[in-house]
UniProtKB/Swiss-Prot annotation:
It is an enzyme of class 2 (transferase). HAMAP family: PEMT. This is Phosphatidylethanolamine N-methyltransferase. The gene is CHO2. Residues 1-44, 95-154, 211-245, 292-339, 398-422, 486-526 are lumenal. Pathway: Phospholipid metabolism; phosphatidylcholine biosynthesis. GO terms for biological process: methylation; phosphatidylcholine biosynthetic process.
Length: 875
């Protein structure tokens, strides 16, 4: 029923109402259905007496009809009549009133409430209203809209009370069937009988609490669909309090829990089917009558609705402007990934089980028979374990290191692609696990279910009904989650893309209004449902795997990341269910005390957990960084000893490196990557013409002073005279940071005559600017420090295409690799060689364009950094 937000403050004048034509009035006090009909102190109108008589007449069925099976059929027929009158009769009237104001127009057209109208119908209706509202009520002083609503209320009273009474008739007659089956302990174990009665009574009491709490909140105005006829002033929004904060549309959802409680008590599948049918019709009524009217009155304005649609469309840009595949939903024949997913799902859910069933009993391996059932089970478990580990590990790496995002940026691929491709991987893995689980059960079905292996095999129809209900619940919950957080949230988008201002807070709309993590339980209830239908050991193990992985992923992967991005206050905000339980079960004084004291420990506990993980990660990163930089941190003396240069102090052979730079006496001399290195040598007159000098990494040669045991890989030159010089450049250089040395070798062999002083090759450090306005200066620095040393021919200007110069190099691909590596090392922004020759597909990439791309990449990575996220949270 349409729900109004704020309870009006009780004043002597009562709440104010306004008709859709603009007339204002004071809304008089009215009574609820139960008090009106059954309270003897309240005066009854003629129509109310007729309603009571009709309700009592249902008892004639027990007196006039002697056969219980006939009674059941009569009551089912009566219930169907009143249920259809409710959902389609009242539904039709409300639809006409909501869209065309038909009921009010009919009253105006017939002058029903006109004092001069003395027709029988007019007099009866006015008499009914006077009896209902009391002698002080003046019909002419109130709008036709309000008086029409009062008449409509009596129609509702008749239909709703008759609907419930005939349903109780179905319950009683079915419970009486088969020698009082609902209490008969000879037909069922006593503990089961008592359990049924207790659980059923609990559901009925819960249903009663829902109805009473709902009525206390929304009053008669919304209970009788008052907002179809007029509006109460200052009630522009929907209410979310009490039971409305715990469940979506409680009058239509959990408000029918009592129906299933009656079915349990009656021990009747007939009652269960009738309850399901009635509940189903009620959901249709909600969807086609109630929700459209709620959206019209309380929903967003036209501009707001358009904005929401535009936001959803914009979100699709992360998925190539198409709705991504979820399971097999949004399937498109034009997407290769969708076709592959369909083939995979069909293969594992149908083809493999069908093939496996055909070789049961005949399959052998090395003469031994293979248990195909065990193989199918092992396959399902292996797939689920693989999916769990791969997705969890991947999300952790993405959360802390942005592994996937950096990989895409390094190849000049838009970061939106990282999310769209992740969505394909994620959906494929999830679909694979569900297909294998369905396939396992399909295999057992076509090979013949061994019911003896079930933990319980009674109540087949009940188990099937509850199992199907759980499966449908998971489908509905998943759909509701996507409606609330979109495909961006469904595929963990905030692990991959920077949060925008529109996503600076966690949503509390839709299903998230009632539960903080609806997927924690309901996200795998479909697996529970299938396990309930076929309760075998294999299914229980699979169900445990699904539930455990779901719990771990939400609490130790997703929640940790959410705290990092949105903050603990957002993540640990009470859900609607929690708020209502606190309000109902904990006194206000204690609740306030707990809320003030409880948040700090919670904060500390979760903070310590997240900080522990972050601390371990930071320590590991620091250790690796120090390890990589350890050569640069060695003292000059240690390096000399490490390279064993001191052993050749008095040698007749000598190598001098001419163009090294010096920064500190304690540190070795250095040059930058790509800079040509000039050496001079001297040796005795009688040296061999086959003497040669090679360039090596110190860490690879330190264990051998007298002989070099590794190849120079082309980084060498002949010594043709007693004195001379040579410039190592291009492919004869190392293109990575490290500590190096030159070695003088004798007679074309690897015996060492001299080892030069060690020196360092460093990458030039280039600071990437924060804004595009500094891109030209940045480009000039890139050209001078990176491109000029690497390319054989210097690039003419920063606006010249890079490819024109690189293509003139002797080693095209190697030059691209060197450029990419040096740019990555110098700027701290990792790119690949593909970045350089793919980036200029439409326009040839220049150094200036490259500098702009690097600035943009830096901005994206900074937006994804913990510091930026913390700054956004503070704002």
């Amino acid at each position: 029923m349409a729900v109004a937000l704020q309870q009006q403050s009780k004043t002597n004048m009562g709440p104010k109402g306004i008709t859709f034509s603009g007339n204002t009035f004071t809304v008089p006090e009215t009574h609820d259905m139960v008090k009106t009909l059954f309270d003897p102190t309240v005066r009854k109108s003629y129509f109310e007496l007729v309603i009571l008589a009709l309700l009592a007449s249902n008892g004639l069925v027990f007196w006039l009809v002697k056969t219980n099976s006939t009674r059941i059929e009569i009551f089912i027929g009566l219930y169907l009549f009143w249920r259809l009158s409710y959902n389609f009769g009242i539904g039709y009237l409300l639809h006409q009133q909501s869209n065309y104001h038909k009921l009010v127009n009919w009253a105006n057209k017939l002058n029903i409430f006109d004092e001069k109208n003395h027709s029988i119908a007019s007099r009866l209706i006015k008499s009914e209203i006077s009896a209902q509202m009391g002698p002080k009520y003046k019909i002419s002083k109130y709008p036709v809209d309000f008086n029409t609503w009062l008449v409509f209320r009596k129609v509702v009273d008749l239909i709703l009370m008759s609907d419930f009474t005939t349903f109780i008739g179905v319950v009683v007659t079915c419970a009486m069937d088969n020698d009082l089956q609902f209490l008969n302990t000879s037909q069922q174990e006593p503990w089961i009988v008592y359990s049924r009665l207790i659980v059923g009574a609990g559901l009925i009491l819960f249903n009663l609490w829902v109805k009473v709490d709902a009525h206390n909140i929304i009053k008669d105005y919304a209970w009788y669909w008052g907002d179809f006829f007029f509006r109460q002033i200052n009630n522009e929004d929907l209410i979310f309090d009490g039971v409305f904060e715990m469940f979506p549309h409680p009058m239509y959802s959990v408000g029918y829990a009592g129906y299933y409680g009656f079915a349990l008590i009656a021990k009747s599948y007939r009652v269960l089917v009738v309850a399901v049918f009635g509940h189903f019709l009620q959901m249709i009524f909600l969807h086609y009558i109630e929700n459209p009217h709620i959206d019209k009155l309380y929903g967003p304005s036209g501009n707001e609705a358009d904005y929401q649609k535009i936001t959803k469309i914009k979100d699709l840009k992360n998925f190539d402007n198409l709705k991504p595949l979820v399971g097999l939903y949004n399937f498109s024949w034009l997407r290769a990934a969708d076709l592959l997913t369909l083939i995979m799902v069909t293969t594992y859910s149908v083809i493999i089980p069908a093939f496996a069933s055909s070789i049961v009993g005949t399959a052998q391996f090395r003469g031994a028979k293979i248990n195909i059932a065990h193989c199918m089970f092992a396959l399902t478990v292996a797939i689920k374990v693989f999916e769990s580990l791969s997705i969890n590990i991947f999300l952790v790496l993405q959360s802390y290191y942005k592994l996937f995002t950096k990989r895409y940026l390094a190849n000049d691929i838009p970061i939106e692609k990282s999310l769209s491709n992740w969505a394909i991987i994620y959906n494929g893995l999830i679909s694979w696990t569900y297909a294998s689980f369905v396939g396992l059960n399909f295999f057992h079905y076509i090979t013949g279910m061994e019911y003896s292996k079930f933990y319980f095999y009674d109540w087949v129809y009940l188990r099937s009904f509850l199992g199907a209900l759980l499966i449908l619940t998971q489908v509905w919950i998943n759909s509701s989650i996507i409606d609330s957080i979109g495909y961006f949230g469904w595929f963990y988008g905030d692990f991959f893309l920077p949060t925008s201002p529109q996503r600076s807070h966690l949503t509390k709309a839709g299903v998230y209004r009632y539960l903080n993590n609806p997927e924690q339980l309901f996200g795998v209830c479909g697996v529970m449902g299938l396990t309930l239908i076929a309760p075998s050991l294999e299914n229980f193990v699979c169900c445990l795997l699904w539930v455990s992985n779901n719990f771990f992923r939400i609490n130790f992967v997703e929640k940790v990341h959410m705290i990092k991005v949105y903050g603990e206050k957002e993540v640990f905000q009470d859900s609607g269910v929690t708020k209502t339980f606190k309000k109902q079960l904990i006194p206000d004084v204690i609740s306030r005390r707990l809320s003030s004291n409880d948040e700090a420990p919670n904060f500390g506990r979760h903070r310590s957990t997240s900080h522990l993980v972050t601390g371990i990660t930071d320590t590991l990163e620091s250790f690796i960084k120090e390890l990589r930089q350890s050569n640069a941190k060695l003292s000059r003396q240690n390096l000399l000893e490490l390279s064993q240069n001191l052993y050749f102090d008095n040698s007749d052979y000598q190598i001098t490196i001419d163009n090294l730079q010096k920064s500190d006496d304690r540190m070795p001399k250095y040059t930058t990557i790509g800079t040509p290195i000039e050496i001079t040598w001297k040796c005795p007159e009688n040296h061999s013409d086959k003497d040669w000098i090679g360039l090596y990494k110190v860490v690879q040669t330190t264990y051998s002073r007298s002989k070099t045991l590794i190849s120079s890989s082309g980084r060498w030159t002949w010594v043709e005279s007693t004195r001379g010089s040579y410039v190592f450049t291009g492919s004869k250089l190392f293109w990575e940071e490290g500590i190096y040395e030159f070695r003088f070798h004798l007679d074309g062999k690897h015996e060492v005559a001299y080892i030069s002083e060690p020196f360092e090759i460093k990458a030039p450090k280039i600071e990437v600017p924060d804004t595009l306005s500094a891109s030209k200066e940045f480009a000039e620095q890139l050209k001078l420090s990176v491109f000029d040393p690497v390319t054989d021919i210097k690039i003419p200007s920063i606006e010249s295409p890079i490819c024109d110069t690189v293509e003139k190099s002797h080693h095209l691909l190697e030059t691209y690799r060197r450029l990419a590596k040096l740019i990555s090392t110098s700027t701290g922004i990792t790119i690949s060689s593909n970045f350089l020759f793919n980036a200029g597909t439409e326009h040839e990439l220049s150094v200036h364009q490259l500098s702009k791309k690097l600035i943009n990449i830096k901005k994206v990575l900074e937006d994804l950094s913990p510091a930026a996220i913390d700054e956004k949270k503070r704002q």
